[in-house]
């Protein structure tokens, strides 16, 4: 590379920063010649696999089992739950031919898999002893996206996890919804450092076929909102459509209660890249970094052999401790090496001090150097990995908290909407009777009602009025401009 630094101002031009980092850090190639479909290169795919590993482990520790269902869904299945299919009809990719033969019935590439799972659940579930049933699959889904596509944020094929859970009672189903939120907190916030707010979505913006939808929104550097996970209480809507029933202890057949959960693995990676990155490139949580440490020897001609041998000793010590390590023995200049590995988000170790038996470590998050004795290199690197995550999480929380505003009138909302972020306002209702007010905000200001926060939910005072229609305010809602 001819440039010595990545050097794109993320704060001033996030769109350019994002488009360049995914290409120059070799995360994504979007030149594949089908709109909305991208090539995941090794650096991004390695991170995606790490996120999948963490998320799948969290699900399985809570009783979920992995499965894999077919990519295609028969048209008859898709049309069994009317509200559900209406929500996805315009986004479905249809298979109409097998070779030169037209199929008798069309097959859908899964836009989501409720209608693939639930016919099988109707066969598998017979009695109370079959419940609860908690299954998940890690897969790609396909949606004929008509909005502008953006790699890792909005595409026609994207990666996620979907969990489909079945219970005997409504109470158990709602407990699962709460557990889904806990998993998101553990993985996305605690282990990846991305803060978010879980909202109850307005009825007009819920998952089609659900009774209620709860979704996690984070804030991107440009102040736009990105949904990164959602969980849905389905009630008995799908169990009645697909006749999923069990025999209770009294010998009565009853419809089950269901939930579904969709962590957006693609979008979680987009959030990690965007929120933690800086003007010099990627800054990654230690746990998902493809390379956790790079050893960069900077020898003179006279010390080349001894410095490189010392570097290999450092590499061996770190690898034997289970860390992902590389050494850069290339002929690039020191500046070119530092530029490349900094852009890729990798902390550096420079074994310059052979005689003193210590190494210099460069922290990618703070861009500061610290020294460590060779015998303590493993302990020091692991400790720094924890500190990097804590620092990234703290920085991200500070940013999000600084981007939450309050308004009591449309004039204030209009002014604040230029800043991005969340705007808290008194609002009439998140039921269908509030839909027209929500549509007006979208039409006039490009703002969406994201919903009511599930933590610290506060009811407006008696005299509070909806900023749009002037009726009595039933809720404080968060507004935002979304991807």
Model-predicted segments: where are they?
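NTP/phosphate- and nucleic-acid-binding module
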Residues: 1-483
